[in-house]
Curated annotation (Swiss-Prot):
Its EC number is 6.3.4.3. The keyword Oxidoreductase does not apply. GO terms for biological process: tetrahydrofolate interconversion. It catalyses: (6S)-5,6,7,8-tetrahydrofolate + formate + ATP = (6R)-10-formyltetrahydrofolate + ADP + phosphate. It is an enzyme of class 6 (ligase). The keyword Ubl conjugation does not apply. This is Formate--tetrahydrofolate ligase.
């Protein structure tokens, strides 16, 4: 049987005017700033007006460690949101925006897949409502003001060798990773080494996604450390007096974007921080607003549960004062087989033994998620090659680990295919059995926070930190940053720092290479291994196959 591509399905969508989607959740047309007919921003005045309403229930969708076989986390998030509406619940979806760089790099973009998508897909994967351009502009303004400050006398006494603030562009461009700036003579400033990151790696992006309102946004921007003096004391963004103008540039970008699913259900698509050097979740303002408008809000966190879900619980929930009622962990038969040692080319053949062998990775994630005091449901994202025996093997394993697995066919059937999963989510959520708590307190020393995650989530024997790292953490504690959560930056492919070590390894250690203070965002980044903040394009980038056809439609985006 031939299946339609995601783009073919998206183009056949019977979209409703965005004002109708807003009315479904109580947003009047006067409180929407339309961008065309099918997307709009929600006004700050409306957001302020609903703050006294009670919260709905929050559902987090996460997954096992990602494999090349693909797990379908966003697809499941969208499918579950549609499924909840299908069974009569008032539900919303909250996901991240797409970055241009990856869309033109490894593969085209998407917002879900099959019959579980958010539309307009093409717009969302290109310029959308301009949020990323605004973030890039605000970041670039600060870059320009730092060098301008140095040029006109350097009142803040910035050590030009210790400028921390790199430039950004929303593109994969390895040639810009390390550059020399201000060449060409005295009129162009003081030459120094610099570099570019991709926009989603910017601390401005992380701040926009954690700020509660514009006032909080401006304060956080001012708190960013941009450089150091010769005495190693920090220079803040507020010392350069850039935070006010940056806030002006970000004023509209702070407003959540309202779009719809293929089944005309409401979705907020807002923000998109990296899931390694930042927290990998959509914006706090979108999530908290959705909780005031819907009975159920379905959101996701980047990569596997050891990265995205851990940061969602320990960083986003802590900062925003929210808590999930239930967590859905997405797994696939294909991924279990790959964890069980089957090559990608052989995943289509039935192999129940390999499924069983690969299940401990899923079991580890279930145990970790439960340690936050939240009930866990496993969603088996169905692929057409799955057999009944393979699905039963996963269900049996999950049952032995004190959870329940539900087969979901949303990719193929839309909300009808996810109705069983939706019913199970409602059944569990309405028991109100969640007793959520982060796995470490604010006042725990920073080094102990790192050790706690390494031992309890990664099941390592220890995190290896040399004297330089420990001294830096102690210094930040003395400077008043000891209460901050830690944001672990490591490979997403394994519980360990070795991307090839699959399954549920124990007895390993987590080497900490460096630590970085994101004072504005409000967390300490703990770098374990190499961190790529500016990706490169592959040998054959997807951009080579993206073009307009004779009808002016985009081809090759997905």
């Amino acid at each position: 049987m031939a299946y339609k591509s995601d783009i073919e399905i998206a183009r056949e969508a019977k979209k409703r005017p965005i004002q109708e989607i807003g009315e479904k959740i109580g947003i009047g047309s006067d409180d929407l700033l339309p961008y065309g007919h099918d997307k709009a921003k929600v006004s700050q005045s409306f957001i302020n007006s609903v703050q006294d309403k009670p919260n709905g229930r929050l559902v987090l969708v996460t997954a096992i460690n990602p494999t090349p076989a693909g797990e379908g986390k966003t697809t499941t998030t969208v499918g579950l949101g549609d499924g909840l509406n299908h069974i009569g619940k008032n539900a919303m979806i909250c996901i991240r925006e797409a970055s241009l760089g990856p869309n033109f790099g490894m593969k085209g973009g998407a917002a879900g897949g099959g019959y579980a998508q958010v539309v307009p897909m093409e717009d969302m994967n290109l310029h959308f409502t301009g949020d990323f351009h605004a973030i890039t502009s605000a970041h670039s303004l600060l870059s320009a003001m730092i060098d301008n400050h140095i040029y006109w006398g350097n009142e803040a006494e910035i050590d030009v060798r210790r400028v921390q603030w790199r430039r950004v562009v929303d593109m994969n461009d390895r040639a810009l990773r390390q550059i020399t700036a201000s060449l060409g003579g005295v009129a162009n400033g003081f030459p120094r080494e610099a570099g570019f990151d991709i926009t989603v790696a910017s601390e401005v992006m992380a701040i926009l996604c954690l700020a509660k309102d514009l006032k909080d946004l401006e304060k956080r921007l001012g708190d960013m450390i941009v450089a150091y003096r010769r005495d190693r004391s920090p220079v803040f963004c507020r010392d350069i007096k850039a935070q006010g103008a940056m806030t002006v540039l970000l004023k509209d970008a702070m407003q959540p974007n309202l779009v719809q699913t293929l089944e005309n259900n409401p979705a907020f698509v807002h923000g998109g921080p990296f899931a390694n050097i930042a927290h990998g979740c959509n914006s706090v303002i979108a999530t908290t607003t959705a909780l005031k408008l819907a009975d159920y809000v379905v959101t996701e966190a980047g990569f596997g549960a050891d990265l995205g879900a851990e940061k969602f619980m320990n960083i986003k929930c802590r900062k925003a004062g929210i808590a999930p009622s239930v967590v859905v962990c997405v797994a696939t038969v294909r991924a279990m087989k790959m964890n069980g040692g089957v090559a990608k080319a052989d995943l289509g053949a039935e192999n129940v033994d390999a499924v069983k062998k690969g299940c401990p990775n899923l079991g580890r994630h279930i145990e970790n998620l439960k340690s936050f005091g939240v009930p866990v449901i496993v969603a088996i994202n169905h692929f057409v090659t799955d057999t009944d025996a393979e699905v039963e093997a996963i269900k049996s394993y999950v049952s032995e680990h004190g959870a329940e697995a539900v087969l979901s066919r949303h990719w193929e059937l839309g909300s009808e295919g996810s109705a069983d999963l939706a019913r199970k989510v409602v059944e569990v959520a309405e028991k109100d059995s969640a007793n959520f708590a982060p796995i470490y307190p604010d006042d725990m020393p920073l080094a102990e926070k790192v050790q706690t995650i390494a031992k309890r989530i990664y099941r390592a024997d220890e995190a290896l930190m040399d004297k330089k790292v420990r001294d830096q953490l102690k210094l930040w504690e003395e400077q008043g940053y000891g209460h901050l959560p830690v944001c672990m930056a490591k490979t997403q492919y394994s519980f360990s720092t070795d991307p090839n070590l699959r399954g549920a390894p124990t007895g390993h250690s987590v080497p900490v290479r460096e630590v970085r203070l994101s004072a504005g965002a409000g967390f300490v980044v703990v770098v374990c291994g190499e961190i790529m903040t500016m990706p490169g394009l592959p040998r054959v980038p997807s951009a080579e196959n993206i073009h307009l056809n004779e009808d002016g439609q985009i081809e090759g985006l997905f």
